[in-house]
Amino acid sequence: MTFEPTETLRDPFVLYGESFASRLLLGTARYPSPATLQAAVEASRPAMITVALRRQTAVGSGDGQTLGGETFWQMLRTLGVPVLPNTAGCFTAQEVITTAMMAREVFETDWIKLELIGDDYTLQPDTLNMPAVAETLVKEGFKVLPYCTEDLVLCRRLLDVGCQALMPWAAPIGTGRGAVNPHAMRTLRDRLPDTPLIVDAGLGLPSHAAQVLEWGYDGVLLNTAVAQSAYPVNMARAFALAVEAGRTAYLAGPMPEREVAQASTPVVGMPFWHAEGAEDRA
Protein backbone atom coordinates (compact mmCIF):
# COMPACT_ATOMS: atom_id res chain seq x y z
CA MET A 1 0.00 0.00 0.00
CA THR A 2 1.32 3.43 -0.90
CA PHE A 3 1.25 6.03 1.87
CA GLU A 4 -0.46 9.25 0.93
CA PRO A 5 0.77 12.28 2.90
CA THR A 6 -2.69 13.83 2.69
CA GLU A 7 -4.54 10.89 4.14
CA THR A 8 -5.16 12.77 7.40
CA LEU A 9 -7.42 15.09 5.40
CA ARG A 10 -9.85 12.18 5.31
CA ASP A 11 -9.93 12.48 9.10
CA PRO A 12 -11.64 15.87 9.33
CA PHE A 13 -11.36 18.13 12.33
CA VAL A 14 -14.97 18.90 13.28
CA LEU A 15 -16.06 21.75 15.55
CA TYR A 16 -19.72 22.60 16.03
CA GLY A 17 -20.57 20.62 12.91
CA GLU A 18 -18.02 22.39 10.69
CA SER A 19 -15.07 20.49 9.19
CA PHE A 20 -11.55 21.88 8.94
CA ALA A 21 -8.59 20.45 7.04
CA SER A 22 -6.02 21.69 9.56
CA ARG A 23 -5.80 20.91 13.27
CA LEU A 24 -3.72 23.99 14.00
CA LEU A 25 -5.13 27.34 15.11
CA LEU A 26 -2.85 30.38 15.08
CA GLY A 27 -2.87 33.58 17.08
CA THR A 28 -2.15 36.93 15.44
CA ALA A 29 -0.43 38.92 18.20
CA ARG A 30 3.21 39.84 18.88
CA TYR A 31 4.65 39.17 15.43
CA PRO A 32 7.58 41.34 14.32
CA SER A 33 5.47 42.78 11.51
CA PRO A 34 2.16 42.26 9.71
CA ALA A 35 4.09 40.86 6.75
CA THR A 36 5.64 38.20 8.98
CA LEU A 37 2.22 37.30 10.36
CA GLN A 38 0.82 36.99 6.85
CA ALA A 39 3.69 34.74 5.77
CA ALA A 40 3.33 32.59 8.89
CA VAL A 41 -0.35 32.05 8.16
CA GLU A 42 0.43 31.13 4.57
CA ALA A 43 3.14 28.70 5.73
CA SER A 44 0.96 26.89 8.26
CA ARG A 45 -2.52 27.15 6.69
CA PRO A 46 -4.34 27.03 10.03
CA ALA A 47 -7.98 26.12 10.53
CA MET A 48 -8.60 29.50 12.18
CA ILE A 49 -6.73 32.60 13.25
CA THR A 50 -7.52 34.13 16.61
CA VAL A 51 -7.97 37.88 17.00
CA ALA A 52 -8.40 40.05 20.08
CA LEU A 53 -10.98 42.79 19.76
CA ARG A 54 -9.45 46.17 20.63
CA ARG A 55 -11.69 48.78 22.15
CA GLN A 56 -9.33 51.39 20.74
CA THR A 57 -7.21 51.14 17.61
CA ALA A 58 -3.75 52.38 18.38
CA VAL A 59 -1.07 52.38 15.71
CA GLY A 60 2.19 50.69 16.72
CA SER A 61 0.74 48.69 19.62
CA GLY A 62 3.88 46.58 19.99
CA ASP A 63 2.18 43.28 19.31
CA GLY A 64 2.63 43.05 15.56
CA GLN A 65 -0.63 44.84 14.79
CA THR A 66 1.21 47.93 13.59
CA LEU A 67 -1.13 48.53 10.68
CA GLY A 68 -3.70 49.66 13.21
CA GLY A 69 -7.47 49.43 13.25
CA GLU A 70 -9.51 48.54 10.22
CA THR A 71 -6.49 48.13 7.95
CA PHE A 72 -5.22 45.27 10.11
CA TRP A 73 -8.58 43.47 10.04
CA GLN A 74 -8.79 43.92 6.28
CA MET A 75 -5.37 42.31 5.94
CA LEU A 76 -6.51 39.33 8.00
CA ARG A 77 -9.60 38.87 5.86
CA THR A 78 -7.50 38.68 2.70
CA LEU A 79 -5.80 35.56 4.09
CA GLY A 80 -8.92 33.51 3.48
CA VAL A 81 -8.77 31.88 6.94
CA PRO A 82 -11.77 31.92 9.31
CA VAL A 83 -11.41 34.38 12.18
CA LEU A 84 -11.90 33.27 15.78
CA PRO A 85 -12.37 36.36 17.97
CA ASN A 86 -11.34 36.04 21.61
CA THR A 87 -12.11 37.84 24.84
CA ALA A 88 -8.48 38.28 25.90
CA GLY A 89 -7.96 40.70 28.76
CA CYS A 90 -11.40 40.18 30.29
CA PHE A 91 -11.57 39.68 34.08
CA THR A 92 -15.34 39.82 34.66
CA ALA A 93 -18.37 38.14 33.20
CA GLN A 94 -19.74 41.44 31.94
CA GLU A 95 -16.49 42.27 30.15
CA VAL A 96 -16.57 38.89 28.41
CA ILE A 97 -20.18 39.21 27.29
CA THR A 98 -19.76 42.80 26.07
CA THR A 99 -16.58 41.93 24.17
CA ALA A 100 -18.18 38.87 22.60
CA MET A 101 -21.17 40.89 21.40
CA MET A 102 -18.90 43.53 19.89
CA ALA A 103 -16.75 40.87 18.24
CA ARG A 104 -19.77 39.24 16.64
CA GLU A 105 -20.77 42.55 15.11
CA VAL A 106 -17.28 43.50 13.93
CA PHE A 107 -16.22 40.12 12.55
CA GLU A 108 -19.66 38.85 11.55
CA THR A 109 -19.18 35.48 13.20
CA ASP A 110 -20.76 33.50 16.03
CA TRP A 111 -17.43 31.87 16.92
CA ILE A 112 -15.85 33.07 20.15
CA LYS A 113 -12.87 31.93 22.16
CA LEU A 114 -13.89 32.47 25.75
CA GLU A 115 -11.10 33.86 27.93
CA LEU A 116 -12.04 34.81 31.48
CA ILE A 117 -8.87 35.46 33.46
CA GLY A 118 -8.85 34.93 37.22
CA ASP A 119 -5.29 35.99 38.03
CA ASP A 120 -3.27 38.61 36.20
CA TYR A 121 0.08 37.08 37.24
CA THR A 122 -0.39 33.48 36.12
CA LEU A 123 -3.17 34.32 33.62
CA GLN A 124 -5.00 31.30 34.99
CA PRO A 125 -8.63 31.04 33.87
CA ASP A 126 -11.37 31.94 36.35
CA THR A 127 -12.62 28.38 36.67
CA LEU A 128 -15.34 29.23 39.21
CA ASN A 129 -17.22 31.74 37.07
CA MET A 130 -16.43 30.40 33.61
CA PRO A 131 -19.31 27.87 33.32
CA ALA A 132 -21.94 30.54 33.99
CA VAL A 133 -20.40 32.89 31.43
CA ALA A 134 -20.14 30.09 28.89
CA GLU A 135 -23.79 29.22 29.44
CA THR A 136 -24.83 32.82 28.78
CA LEU A 137 -22.83 32.95 25.55
CA VAL A 138 -24.27 29.63 24.37
CA LYS A 139 -27.79 30.93 24.99
CA GLU A 140 -26.90 34.02 22.94
CA GLY A 141 -26.09 31.78 20.00
CA PHE A 142 -22.29 31.74 20.19
CA LYS A 143 -20.12 28.77 19.28
CA VAL A 144 -18.01 28.87 22.41
CA LEU A 145 -14.45 27.57 22.65
CA PRO A 146 -13.48 28.06 26.30
CA TYR A 147 -9.86 28.48 27.38
CA CYS A 148 -9.70 26.38 30.54
CA THR A 149 -7.43 24.22 32.66
CA GLU A 150 -7.10 20.44 32.41
CA ASP A 151 -9.45 20.02 35.39
CA LEU A 152 -11.87 17.22 34.51
CA VAL A 153 -14.73 18.48 36.68
CA LEU A 154 -14.54 21.97 35.16
CA CYS A 155 -14.45 20.54 31.66
CA ARG A 156 -17.52 18.40 32.32
CA ARG A 157 -19.36 21.43 33.65
CA LEU A 158 -18.51 23.42 30.51
CA LEU A 159 -19.91 20.59 28.40
CA ASP A 160 -23.04 20.52 30.56
CA VAL A 161 -23.79 24.18 29.82
CA GLY A 162 -23.53 23.67 26.06
CA CYS A 163 -19.90 23.97 24.99
CA GLN A 164 -19.17 21.43 22.25
CA ALA A 165 -15.38 21.74 22.35
CA LEU A 166 -12.81 22.66 25.00
CA MET A 167 -9.42 24.38 25.01
CA PRO A 168 -7.42 23.18 28.04
CA TRP A 169 -3.96 24.58 28.64
CA ALA A 170 -0.75 22.57 28.66
CA ALA A 171 1.00 25.18 30.80
CA PRO A 172 0.45 28.86 31.65
CA ILE A 173 0.20 31.23 28.69
CA GLY A 174 3.50 32.15 27.11
CA THR A 175 5.68 29.80 29.16
CA GLY A 176 6.55 27.42 26.31
CA ARG A 177 7.02 24.53 28.75
CA GLY A 178 4.85 21.96 27.05
CA ALA A 179 2.54 19.67 29.02
CA VAL A 180 3.42 20.17 32.70
CA ASN A 181 0.78 17.72 33.94
CA PRO A 182 0.77 14.84 31.45
CA HIS A 183 -1.22 12.56 33.74
CA ALA A 184 -4.11 15.01 34.06
CA MET A 185 -4.10 15.78 30.36
CA ARG A 186 -4.14 12.13 29.36
CA THR A 187 -6.85 11.43 31.92
CA LEU A 188 -8.94 14.25 30.47
CA ARG A 189 -8.55 12.79 26.99
CA ASP A 190 -9.48 9.30 28.20
CA ARG A 191 -12.54 10.47 30.13
CA LEU A 192 -13.89 12.71 27.36
CA PRO A 193 -13.26 10.55 24.30
CA ASP A 194 -15.91 12.16 22.11
CA THR A 195 -15.20 15.81 22.91
CA PRO A 196 -12.95 17.88 20.63
CA LEU A 197 -10.01 19.00 22.79
CA ILE A 198 -7.66 21.72 21.56
CA VAL A 199 -4.55 22.40 23.60
CA ASP A 200 -4.35 26.14 24.14
CA ALA A 201 -1.38 27.81 25.86
CA GLY A 202 1.98 26.62 27.09
CA LEU A 203 3.35 24.89 24.00
CA GLY A 204 6.80 26.05 22.96
CA LEU A 205 8.17 23.47 20.53
CA PRO A 206 6.78 21.49 17.60
CA SER A 207 7.59 18.35 19.60
CA HIS A 208 5.19 19.56 22.30
CA ALA A 209 2.42 19.79 19.71
CA ALA A 210 3.23 16.38 18.26
CA GLN A 211 3.14 14.87 21.74
CA VAL A 212 -0.38 16.02 22.61
CA LEU A 213 -1.66 14.99 19.18
CA GLU A 214 -0.12 11.55 19.79
CA TRP A 215 -2.14 11.38 23.01
CA GLY A 216 -5.31 11.87 21.01
CA TYR A 217 -5.88 15.59 21.40
CA ASP A 218 -7.67 17.01 18.41
CA GLY A 219 -5.70 20.18 17.78
CA VAL A 220 -3.52 22.95 19.16
CA LEU A 221 -3.67 26.72 19.30
CA LEU A 222 -0.36 28.59 19.08
CA ASN A 223 0.76 32.17 19.27
CA THR A 224 3.87 33.05 21.28
CA ALA A 225 5.73 29.89 20.24
CA VAL A 226 5.52 31.06 16.63
CA ALA A 227 5.45 34.84 16.91
CA GLN A 228 8.38 35.12 19.32
CA SER A 229 10.64 32.56 17.65
CA ALA A 230 13.70 33.72 15.74
CA TYR A 231 12.09 32.83 12.40
CA PRO A 232 8.29 32.82 12.82
CA VAL A 233 7.50 31.67 9.28
CA ASN A 234 9.76 28.63 9.57
CA MET A 235 8.40 27.85 13.03
CA ALA A 236 4.82 28.08 11.79
CA ARG A 237 5.60 25.53 9.11
CA ALA A 238 7.39 23.31 11.63
CA PHE A 239 4.36 23.30 13.91
CA ALA A 240 2.03 22.47 11.01
CA LEU A 241 4.19 19.47 10.14
CA ALA A 242 4.36 18.40 13.80
CA VAL A 243 0.59 18.52 14.16
CA GLU A 244 0.15 16.37 11.07
CA ALA A 245 2.82 13.94 12.27
CA GLY A 246 1.28 13.67 15.72
CA ARG A 247 -2.21 13.02 14.39
CA THR A 248 -0.92 10.48 11.86
CA ALA A 249 0.97 8.69 14.64
CA TYR A 250 -2.15 8.60 16.83
CA LEU A 251 -4.21 7.11 14.01
CA ALA A 252 -1.44 4.58 13.31
CA GLY A 253 -1.83 3.12 16.79
CA PRO A 254 1.46 3.46 18.70
CA MET A 255 2.97 0.38 20.32
CA PRO A 256 2.28 -0.04 24.05
CA GLU A 257 4.96 0.93 26.52
CA ARG A 258 6.71 -1.90 28.35
CA GLU A 259 8.69 -2.08 31.57
CA VAL A 260 11.27 -4.55 30.23
CA ALA A 261 13.13 -5.00 26.96
CA GLN A 262 11.71 -7.21 24.24
CA ALA A 263 13.80 -8.33 21.28
CA SER A 264 12.68 -6.87 17.97
CA THR A 265 14.54 -9.50 15.93
CA PRO A 266 13.26 -13.12 16.13
CA VAL A 267 15.90 -15.67 17.12
CA VAL A 268 14.51 -18.48 14.95
CA GLY A 269 16.85 -18.99 12.00
CA MET A 270 19.79 -17.25 13.62
CA PRO A 271 22.99 -19.20 14.35
CA PHE A 272 22.69 -21.09 17.61
CA TRP A 273 19.06 -20.04 18.04
CA HIS A 274 18.31 -23.50 19.41
CA ALA A 275 21.08 -23.35 21.98
CA GLU A 276 20.17 -23.24 25.63
CA GLY A 277 19.53 -19.65 26.81
CA ALA A 278 19.46 -18.15 23.31
CA GLU A 279 16.04 -16.56 23.79
CA ASP A 280 17.15 -15.05 27.08
CA ARG A 281 20.15 -13.42 25.40
CA ALA A 282 18.17 -12.09 22.39
Swiss-Prot record:
SUPFAM superfamilies with a match to the protein in the record: ThiG-like
MF-aspect GO terms: thiazole synthase activity
Keyword Transferase in record: yes
Biological or metabolic pathway of the protein: Cofactor biosynthesis; thiamine diphosphate biosynthesis
Keyword Cytoplasm among UniProt keywords: yes
Active site (record annotation): 113 (schiff-base intermediate with dxp)
The entry's keywords: Cytoplasm, Schiff base, Thiamine biosynthesis, Transferase
Binding site for 1-deoxy-D-xylulose 5-phosphate: 174, 201-202, 223-224
InterPro entries in the record: Aldolase_TIM, Thiazole_synthase_ThiG, ThiG
Gene3D superfamilies, A to Z: Aldolase class I
Signal peptide range: none
Transmembrane segments: none
GO CC terms in record: cytoplasm
Major enzyme class: transferase
A single GO BP: thiamine diphosphate biosynthetic process
Family of the protein in this entry: Belongs to the ThiG family.
Assembly, per entry: Homotetramer. Forms heterodimers with either ThiH or ThiS.
Chain's role: Catalyzes the rearrangement of 1-deoxy-D-xylulose 5-phosphate (DXP) to produce the thiazole phosphate moiety of thiamine. Sulfur is provided by the thiocarboxylate moiety of the carrier protein ThiS. In vitro, sulfur can be provided by H(2)S.
PANTHER family named among the record's database cross-references: THIAZOLE SYNTHASE
Protein name: Thiazole synthase
Taxonomic source organism: Cupriavidus metallidurans (strain ATCC 43123 / DSM 2839 / NBRC 102507 / CH34)
